[in-house]
Amino acid sequence: MGVGLPAAFHRNIPYFEGSGVTTYAEIDVQRKIEKEQYVGLCEDSKIGISLIFTLQNGVEYMREKQAGLTKDVQTSVTFSGLAQDGMILLPVNKNEQQILNEKRASDTRRELMNAARKGDQAAIETLTFDDMDLYSKVSKRLANEDVFSIVDTYFMPFGAECDMYSIMGEILAVRERINRMTGVRLYQMRLNVNELTFDICVPADSVMGEPEIGRRFKGTIWLQGYITF
């Protein structure tokens, strides 16, 4: 699964090649100390955290680095995720006005986060107060509602490994595939997670529920990425 990746990468570790462009960002790449493997780090204002991922085209990156073409380069990244299992959840019911309000709030928050990164003290204070207000509202709702009826998507670091994340996102597309190395039946899903769009792959027999467009996938993924130089 996946075509055109360096042989040294997919010969040694599992991989899944995603599609499209997930984000445009300045990428920092570091080699893992214990192995010939590279991790990338980028920031995306949609998520609000630094994303660390296993780099699929590390050999190509080293070639570009030796040519002096990678320093402070803002480029596109295609993310993909490998999951061992997961759960399918029904969507949160929202009307058009709620969707519009959330879109406006998300755009405003993104602008504030960009300003905060540049040292804007007013933006930092606004974000702090907004987070406190959100925490208060969610805490009150949790007394009578299930958390998954309040939070419809999230992207959070998971465990000690820097490139593992716990996610929940809307299913935009789904299809079945077969792992040609193992013969295992897989679900390939395209997800919208905190406005980041990327593909994941998970063994079909390890998914609780039936994935359909509009429903949500919840699970833990190993985040991989392909940098386009």
Question: What annotation goes with each model-predicted range?
Answer:
Residues 158-170, 215:
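Short coil-to-beta-strand transition motifs
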Residues 160, 178-180, 207-212:
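Beta-strand elements of modular eukaryotic interaction domains
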Residues 51-53, 199-204:
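Short amphipathic beta-strand/extended segments with alternating polar/hydrophobic composition
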Residues 222-229:
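Short, Lys/Arg- and Gly-enriched loop/turn segments at beta-strand edges
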Residues 1-159:
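Long, hydrophobic alpha/beta structural blocks
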Residues 203-219:
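Short nucleic-acid-contacting surface segments enriched for D/E, G, S/T with interspersed K/R
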Residues 173-200:
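OB-fold (S1/OB) nucleic-acid-binding surfaces
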